[in-house]
């Protein structure tokens, strides 16, 4: 049995851990508000831009001058999985849920005879994926030194992806990230970004409105598609940022509660042990007095 001193040390250690987890919970809560506002503000712009480009793409469908980013290479043999995760842990299942979705997609594609490559954004995703797919990871971008996410960070990633696409390294690119829903709910999401997925009009939608574009649709798409790619990546990074702080806040709250339960149990054991030792000493004193 542990001595009373060991028990006191253990209780003090648990209390110190509880203070740390409580502080981390409060920091995550304060950062979550700003991150959530940024993610929610980026959604309408990203969704509307995707919709506008989809409308223009529908008008340019079949055009011989359509950008390759729109129609793709015409093949789907080589898939690039752009996996965006966090730089830090202590956030529950935030990182592992994104990696799990990407891993499941990779295995499904490989079972179909496809070639799979990984482009990792974030240290945690890279560390998990390299255990299984180290030879298939073509690039890893870390944002550890970035104090505040900006569009320039997403634009740099988009340029790297486009450069690899233009070099013929892949046919299809899918973006993986965690969509922020609430503090306790983050949804792992997969979104195809190359080639652009154009939604077919509904059967009962009626005649589509006619638009004239100036300049021509192909020229507009040539300019907007790289921009849209950066916008979608930026949105994913902002969603991830909010999801990370939401998951961390929830995880640290659970850790703080668990530490409180441990402290109560340890204190109960300590008090019972101390009481038993005092009772034993009293019995020994009384027995000695009676013997005299």
From Swiss-Prot:
Bilayer topology reads: Peripheral membrane protein
Q: Which domain of life is it from?
A: Bacteria
Q: Does the keyword Membrane apply?
A: yes
Transport among the record's keywords? Answer: yes
BP-aspect Gene Ontology terms: proton motive force-driven plasma membrane ATP synthesis
Pfam families linked to this entry: ATP-synt
Q: Where in the cell is it found?
A: Cell inner membrane
Q: Which GO terms describe its molecular function?
A: ATP binding; proton-transporting ATP synthase activity, rotational mechanism
GO CC term, one of those recorded: proton-transporting ATP synthase complex
Just give the chief location class: membrane
* Keyword entries, A-Z: ATP synthesis, Cell inner membrane, Cell membrane, CF(1), Hydrogen ion transport, Ion transport, Membrane, Transport
Function of this protein?
Produces ATP from ADP in the presence of a proton gradient across the membrane. The gamma chain is believed to be important in regulating ATPase activity and the flow of protons through the CF(0) complex.
Similarity comment: family membership: Belongs to the ATPase gamma chain family.
Describe its assembly.
F-type ATPases have 2 components, CF(1) - the catalytic core - and CF(0) - the membrane proton channel. CF(1) has five subunits: alpha(3), beta(3), gamma(1), delta(1), epsilon(1). CF(0) has three main subunits: a, b and c.
HAMAP family, A to Z:
ATP_synth_gamma_bact (MF_00815)
The protein's name is: ATP synthase gamma chain
């Amino acid at each position: 049995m542990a001595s009373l001193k060991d028990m006191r040390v253990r209780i003090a250690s648990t209390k110190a851990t509880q203070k740390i987890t409580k502080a981390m919970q409060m920091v995550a809560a304060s950062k979550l508000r700003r991150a959530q506002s940024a993610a929610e503000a980026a959604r309408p712009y990203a969704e509307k831009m995707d919709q506008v480009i989809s409308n223009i793409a529908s008008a340019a469908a079949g055009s011989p001058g359509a950008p390759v980013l729109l129609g793709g290479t015409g093949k789907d043999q080589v898939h690039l999985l752009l996996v965006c995760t966090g730089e830090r842990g202590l956030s529950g299942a935030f990182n592992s849920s994104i990696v799990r979705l990407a891993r499941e997609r990779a295995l499904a594609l490989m079972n179909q005879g496809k070639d799979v490559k990984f482009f990792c954004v974030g240290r945690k995703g890279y560390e998990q994926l390299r255990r299984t797919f180290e030879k298939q990871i073509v690039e890893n971008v870390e944002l550890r030194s970035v104090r505040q996410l900006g569009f320039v960070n997403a634009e740099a990633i988009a340029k790297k992806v486009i450069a690899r696409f233009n070099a013929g390294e892949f046919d299809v690119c899918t973006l993986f990230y965690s969509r922020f829903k609430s503090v306790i709910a983050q949804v792992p999401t997969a979104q195809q970004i190359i080639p652009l997925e154009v939604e077919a009009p509904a059967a009962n939608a009626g005649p589509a409105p006619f638009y004239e574009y100036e300049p021509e649709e192909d020229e507009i798409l040539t300019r907007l598609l790289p921009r849209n790619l950066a916008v979608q990546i930026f949105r994913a990074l902002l969603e991830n940022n909010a999801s990370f702080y939401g998951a961390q806040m929830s995880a640290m709250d659970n850790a703080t509660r668990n530490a409180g339960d441990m402290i109560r149990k340890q204190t109960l054991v300590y008090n019972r042990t101390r009481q038993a030792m005092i009772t034993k000493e009293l019995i020994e004193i009384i027995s000695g007095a009676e013997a005299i």
